[in-house]
């Protein structure tokens, strides 16, 4: 038995510079062998998304509502945006559209399960899976709306390893019934992270793609993380 599915979505919002894209792929297969005594199940799943989101929804739409429509849509001869002086602390909506709040996410998972009937009442089961995830975030605020500008890049990754093996026995005779199970399980997770925040940009042309051109790093804005917890367990039960 083989199954495959595929999905793709391209979502364009009312704000032309913002959009969302999602891609999903899934494959599954089930196979029997040795006259059905061995059953194998295999699956692969992949997901990818790209999101170009609004940095501050409330600020953007309030700015659009408060903007004087007689003002130019772009910058003046000096490269500055003309603001509505009657609206306090409100930037030109055109300048706010240069803000970026982008993210990318990728997920991958695969698993394999086996079930083998050694005897009619003795079953060996095994299952293993691997998962990988990656999330990237990137933000940019130009100097028109943020003093000295603001740039942020972050990437976070995760891996999960899981395996399970069990042996079960089931038998009945007369008025008696016996169930016995013994199993072992292991789980390991790895998490890594790296993020950088910077200010003091001299030009808005590079967006978040040239952090090296910035002049300052806020305290605590640059760091990394790593952790790798694991868990192993053994269990058994007998019911008579």
Regions found by a protein language model. Name each.
Residues 2, 236-240:
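Short, contiguous hydrophobic alpha-helices characteristic of membrane insertion segments
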Residues 6-10:
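Transmembrane beta-strand segments that form the barrel wall of outer-membrane beta-barrel proteins
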Residues 110-116, 130:
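Alpha-helical support elements that line or immediately flank enzyme active sites
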Residues 115-120, 238:
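Long hydrophobic segments that form regular secondary structure
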């Amino acid at each position: 038995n083989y199954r495959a599915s595929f999905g793709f979505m391209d979502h364009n919002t009312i704000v032309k510079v913002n959009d969302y894209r999602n891609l999903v792929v899934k494959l599954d297969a089930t196979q029997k062998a040795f006259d059905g005594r061995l059953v194998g199940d295999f699956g692969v799943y992949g997901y990818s998304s790209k999101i170009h989101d609004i940095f501050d929804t409330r600020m953007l739409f309030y700015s659009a509502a408060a903007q004087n429509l007689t003002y130019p849509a772009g910058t003046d001869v000096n490269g500055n945006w003309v603001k509505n002086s009657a609206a306090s602390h409100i930037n030109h909506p055109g300048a706010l559209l240069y803000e970026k709040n982008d993210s990318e996410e990728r997920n991958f998972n695969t698993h394999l399960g086996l079930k083998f009937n050694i005897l009619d009442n003795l079953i060996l089961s095994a299952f293993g899976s691997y998962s990988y995830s990656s999330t990237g975030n990137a933000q940019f605020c130009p100097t028109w709306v943020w003093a000295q500008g603001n740039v942020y890049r972050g990437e976070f990754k995760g891996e999960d390893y899981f395996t399970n093996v069990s042996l079960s026995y089931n038998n009945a005779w007369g008025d008696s019934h016996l169930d016995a199970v013994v199993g072992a399980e292991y789980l390991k997770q790895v998490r890594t992270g790296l993020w950088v925040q910077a200010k003091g940009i001299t030009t808005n042309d590079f967006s978040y793609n040239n952090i090296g051109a910035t002049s300052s790093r806020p305290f605590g804005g640059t760091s990394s993380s790593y952790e790798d917890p694991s868990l192993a367990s053994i269990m058994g039960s007998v019911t008579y």
